[in-house]
Structure formats: C-alpha cells, structure tokens
Regions:
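N-terminal amphipathic/basic-hydrophobic helices that include classical n-h-c signal peptides
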Residues: 1-7
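Cytosolic, long alpha-helical scaffolding segments
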Residues: 7-222
Length: 222
C-alpha cells in the first residue's frame, strides 16, 4: 500500500512538471523584459546618436526573441491537455508580457525617431519605473510554480507594480505640465510629449501583466 502511494505521488509529480511547461517561458520573457528595460535606462545616460542606435538594437533583439518565444508557447498550448493553469490564463499572462516588451521597444525607438536635444529628469524617472516593474515581474514569475504557497509574495509584487504605475502617472502628468509651461517651440513640445507617452504606456502595460496574474491567483485561492 505504501509502495503504491509512492508510485502515485511520483506519477503526480511528473504530471505537475509536465503541466508547468509554461513556467520557463514566463521566466524567459521576464529575462527579456529585464534586459530591455535596463538597456532603455542606459539610453537615458547618453546623448550620442550612435550609442542610442546600438542600444535600440539591443532592445529590438529582445522584442524579436520575445515574439518568437510567444509563438513557441502558442504551439505548445495547442498540443498540451493538462496544465495547472487554464490555457486562456497562460495566454493572457504571456501576451501581456509580450505587449510590455513591445512598448519598451517603442520607447527605445522614440529616442531614435525624435532625437531629443536633452533628457529631462522626468523622462529618466519613467524609464526607471519601467525597469523596476520588470524586476518585480521577474520576481513574481519565480513564485508561480506554487501559487497557493507563494500567494503573499506574488500579491506583494503585483502591488509593487501597481504602485510604480501610479508613481509613473504622477511623473507623466507633472512632466506634461512642465513642458507646456517651459517649452516655447511647439515641435519640441510634441516631441517630448510623445516620448513621455511611450514610456508611460509601458508602465500601464506592466500593470496589465500584474492584473492578469492577480486574476489567476485569486482563482487558485477560491
């Protein structure tokens, strides 16, 4: 009887591991997000166009690899029948992470596109918020292997991402007021406003990832 129980537990462990095939995908997406956001922050530390182009290519490489990873996940989902999360939940999390990566890439492209004459502190702050959110996402993903046991840690990182998004909103609104009051050239106003909008949109995208994860963990705690 004991031997049978051990055999059943071993079988269940294999099924669970097989059912968690999506976790390495989430982890890799989080790695791309962290590298891309760190590279975006590095763009704030230089005014050299060649350096911007080089760093933008690094972000783009992460975005391309992220797209390929998402395609691979979709293929795996079509073949898998047993997972600890529902397919729709896995897709929602993965697609929102990919959307965040797209927004980071768009933010990096905006520097190359608009070639700003300066980088205001608020712009650099927005990039730092994105990087901090990416770090929180990486930590959050590492806990998804056992949602019930790690509920508090996951919820904490979700809350951290939300707080960073709120801080980014405040910074964005302050910056828009700043440029309209201090920038006399209408073209420059549009330029800096668009750059700030891209960055703020990325912080919103990070919150959407967090919101999708919140929905999943709440289902598991019902």
């Amino acid at each position: 009887c004991l031997r049978l129980r051990i055999m059943i537990m071993e079988l269940l462990n294999k099924i669970v591991k097989r059912g968690q095939f999506y976790l390495p995908v989430f982890a890799q997406q989080a790695t791309y997000l962290q590298h891309a956001s760190k590279t975006l922050c590095a763009m704030m530390e230089t005014m050299e166009m060649p350096k911007w182009r080089s760093l933008e290519k690094e972000v783009k490489a992460c975005e391309v690899q992220g797209d390929a990873l998402l395609t691979e996940l979709h293929e795996q989902l079509s073949e898998k029948f047993m997972t600890r999360l529902k397919k729709i939940d896995i897709q929602a999390i993965a697609m929102s992470m990919d959307e965040l990566l797209d927004h980071i890439n768009d933010s990096a492209k905006s520097f190359h596109l608009y070639s700003p004459d300066r980088i205001d502190p608020q712009i650099a702050d927005l990039a730092q918020y994105i990087h901090a959110q990416a770090d929180a996402l990486r930590q959050m993903v590492s806990y998804l292997g056992d949602i019930k046991a790690n509920y508090a840690q996951i919820a904490l990182q979700c809350e951290r991402i939300t707080e960073l998004e709120h801080a980014a909103d405040d910074t964005y609104e302050e910056y828009i007021g700043f440029i309209f009051n201090n920038e006399k050239d209408a073209i420059q106003v549009i330029k800096y406003k668009n750059i700030a909008e891209q960055l703020e949109a990325a912080t919103d995208a990070a919150k959407r990832v967090s919101d999708n994860v919140r929905k999943v963990i709440l289902k598991h705690m019902e």
